[in-house]
Structures are given as structure tokens and as C-alpha cells.
């Protein structure tokens, strides 16, 4: 039976974007089969909710966003979409509340002056979006290489790792016989310590795992999100625009406020 690419539940959206880094051992509990099976069935379960609660980086953001929206469910679709892709709800969240959240959560990892500067930067206000976690060094909570978390190392190495870790968007050019998609996307690049989106280029994205896909039916011209090289979901034009908007916002902020060494 084909796997539906339509996501109607926040837990499924979160699972789709969490699956591959969890499979690679970078974040979350050892419940990868629960994530995969839930994505394939497109159904929420108590086992899935419990697995997602084990993501020490993502889940607190989801809970914070949901609480800010007045939602009792931390995996409310609006909260999951806000964090993983971006939507208008992010701009309704109190900057003061988010500042308090980051200060309390990361006080042992960064000096409070750094977090304060994020909110004082004359660029964009920080949003609880996945790209903020990637570009502003909060990924020290994961198990990615030290050069990524600290921002140290050659530009191409750090930029390449950030490119894999952020949620990318790509327009499908073709599909091959091995279950891969060739998409055109804007890669993250770093030059002299500054991040930017590079010239659109084709890249291969894995679209199947064990013969099944989260983006079943994706065709030429469709847009898909992908994370650590794996296709997560088919995007609407509005979602593409939001994902790009909040990615650029967080990238600009990262360039304006250097990570403390």
C-alpha cells in the first residue's frame, strides 16, 4: 500500500524530520523503528509520542511553542510545523518568553550575555525554529562533530555539516531507479566565517528506506523538505516560502552574533 505523503498530525511531521538524524545516531532515543513505522502508517501512537519526548533538543522547543499557542498538546500540528518548517505562529510568540526559555535551558552551555545579544541584534529576532538551533550553536546538545557545534574548522567543513543538519527544501528534477530524488536546492555555504545560501545546484536525496518513502508520489516540479540527505515531506508553496524565510532569518542572526568560543 502506498505511503501517504500528506501529513495531518504534528507527531508525524516531527517524526518525519527526526527520523534520519535518529537513524544515524545523532539525536533522540533508540526508537528508530517506532519513528519509521509511524511515518509509514501515518498514525500517531503513544509509543511515537514517548519516542519524540526523548529528543532532548527538539522536544523542549515544541513544548514551548505549543504552550505559547495555548495548545495542550506539545505535538500540536501548528507547533510542529512552526519548529520544523516555519509558519506565522512563530511571529506571535513573545520574544521575552523565548529569551527566558533559552536562558534557562542553555545557562550551563553559554554565557547569558550571548543569549542576550541574540535578542539585541539589529537584524531579526530569534524564533524557536530548527535553523536557530543549527546555526547558533545550540546543536552542542547533539552528537555531531565538535567542529560543527563550535563553529571551528574550515569553512567548507562547517558549512557542509550545517547544510546537512538544517532542514533543506528542494525542487524535484527527477527520480532514479534506486529510490533517490535529484532536487535543485540552495546549499548552505560559509565564507570567512559567514554563512550564506549558495547558487542553486542539483543534489541527490534519499527518498526510500527499506523500500518505502515518506514522499510517495513526489513528481518533477514538486518541493520536498530533506534532513541529513533524506526526504521528509512534500511541501506546499507557502511552506517553501516560510522555510526559506526563517532559515535566512536565523542565518543572518548567526552572522551578526558570533558564537562564544
PLM region spans:
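Short, Lys/Arg- and Gly-enriched loop/turn segments at beta-strand edges
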Residues: 229-242
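Short peripheral tails and domain-boundary helices/loops at the edges of structured domains
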Residues: 239-261
Amino acid at each position: 500500500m502506498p505511503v501517504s505523503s500528506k501529513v495531518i498530525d504534528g507527531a508525524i511531521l516531527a517524526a518525519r524530520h527526526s527520523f534520519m538524524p535518529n537513524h544515524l545516531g545523532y539525536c533522540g532515543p533508540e526508537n528508530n523503528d517506532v519513528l519509521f513505522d509511524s511515518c509509514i502508517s501515518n498514525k500517531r501512537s503513544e509509543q511515537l509520542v514517548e519516542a519524540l519526548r526523548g529528543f532532548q533538543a527538539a522536544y523542549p522547543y515544541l513544548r514551548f511553542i505549543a504552550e505559547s499557542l495555548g495548545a495542550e498538546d506539545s505535538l500540536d500540528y501548528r507547533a510542529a510545523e512552526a519548529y520544523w518548517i516555519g509558519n506565522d505562529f512563530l511571529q506571535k510568540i513573545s520574544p521575552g518568553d523565548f529569551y527566558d526559555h533559552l536562558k534557562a535551558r542553555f545557562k550551563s552551555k553559554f554565557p547569558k550575555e550571548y543569549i542576550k545579544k541574540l535578542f539585541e541584534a539589529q537584524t531579526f529576532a530569534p524564533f524557536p525554529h530548527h535553523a536557530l538551533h543549527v546555526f547558533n550553536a545550540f546543536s552542542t546538545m547533539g552528537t555531531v562533530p565538535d567542529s560543527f557545534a563550535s563553529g571551528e574548522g574550515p569553512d567548507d567543513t562547517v558549512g557542509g555539516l550545517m547544510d546537512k543538519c538544517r532542514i533543506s527544501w528542494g525542487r524535484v528534477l527527477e527520480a532514479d531507479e534506486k529510490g533517490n530524488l535529484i532536487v535543485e536546492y540552495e546549499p548552505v555555504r560559509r565564507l570567512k566565517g559567514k554563512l550564506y545560501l549558495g547558487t542553486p545546484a542539483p543534489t541527490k536525496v534519499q527518498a526510500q528506506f527499506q523500500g518505502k518513502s515518506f514522499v510517495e508520489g513526489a513528481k518533477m516540479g514538486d518541493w520536498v523538505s530533506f534532513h541529513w540527505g533524506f526526504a521528509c515531506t512534500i511541501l506546499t508553496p507557502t511552506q517553501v516560502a516560510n522555510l526559506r524565510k526563517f532559515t535566512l532569518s536565523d542565518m543572518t542572526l548567526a552572522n551578526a552574533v558570533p558564537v562564544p568560543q
